[in-house]
A protein has these predicted regions:
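A Zn2+-metalloprotease active-site environment signal
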Residues: 1-230
Length: 230
């Protein structure tokens, strides 16, 4: 909420009606499926903003239903509607799976372990540095990667059930990899799966998701507040 307020004060909330309508139509279909998956989220205050930050290739969704996407992602990735749906479905999946709260719990647990190691050592400064590194490698990074993998799985299903082509999840990450220039830390030092790992896993999910996408019938929408009203 504070982040959105900051961007509003800076005049960085996009008001272009065509772009806002595009984002609104996509997110309303995704949210309808999110509510089917977790009915209690019907009470969330679902809203989405487009933030004018051309250098930021990012999007997010918080528990409670507040979403945002940055113009840098739209401009640099140039996503199709199906690909843009995969982005937002992935972020909605993080909120549905409560990953923000899980990350806070993991961070608190690893910090407690680091502090305990420092207290018990006769060289507390050096020990705490080593313990912090070990905690990041052993706890924080694997948990972050697990959350990303789970969000990929939930997100591609949400998007397929909302009528968006699951094959776009693969092409999206091909584009993401191209924008990133192929530069990434080793997998064991990354909070995200590598692009290759991600594409392989998504490719494996596509055949299971195609029936949802190809299923006949109307795709419902759920109201989402759009633009400067959030």
């Amino acid at each position: 909420v504070q982040e959105i307020g900051k961007y509003r004060q800076q005049g960085k909330l996009v008001t272009d009606p065509r772009l806002l309508q595009r984002v609104e139509v996509i997110t309303e279909r995704l949210v309808a499926q999110a509510v089917k998956m977790r009915p209690e989220t019907a009470k969330w205050d679902w809203s989405v903003q487009v933030i004018d930050e051309p250098k930021t290739v990012n999007a997010w969704c918080m528990a409670g239903g507040r979403m945002a996407i940055y113009t840098g992602l739209i401009q640099k990735i140039d996503p199709t509607d199906d690909e843009l749906a995969q982005v937002m479905a992935h972020e909605i999946a993080h909120a549905l799976a409560n990953h923000t709260a899980e990350r806070m719990s993991v961070a608190m647990a690893s910090q407690a372990g680091v502090l305990a190691a420092g207290i018990l050592s006769d060289q507390p400064g050096q020990t705490m540095v080593l313990a912090a590194t070990a905690a990041k490698l052993a706890v924080d990074l694997p948990n972050s990667r697990t959350a990303e993998t789970e969000a990929d799985r939930i997100g591609i299903e949400l998007a397929a059930k909302a009528g968006f082509d699951p094959r776009a999840a693969v092409t999206l990450w091909q584009k993401m990899g191209a924008v990133g220039g192929g530069k990434a830390p080793p997998a064991f030092l990354s909070t995200h799966p590598t692009d290759a790992q991600r594409k392989d896993r998504l490719n494996a999910l596509v055949p299971k998701m195609l029936p949802y996408y190809q299923s006949p019938g109307a795709r419902p929408s759920h109201p989402v507040r759009i633009g400067g009203s959030a």
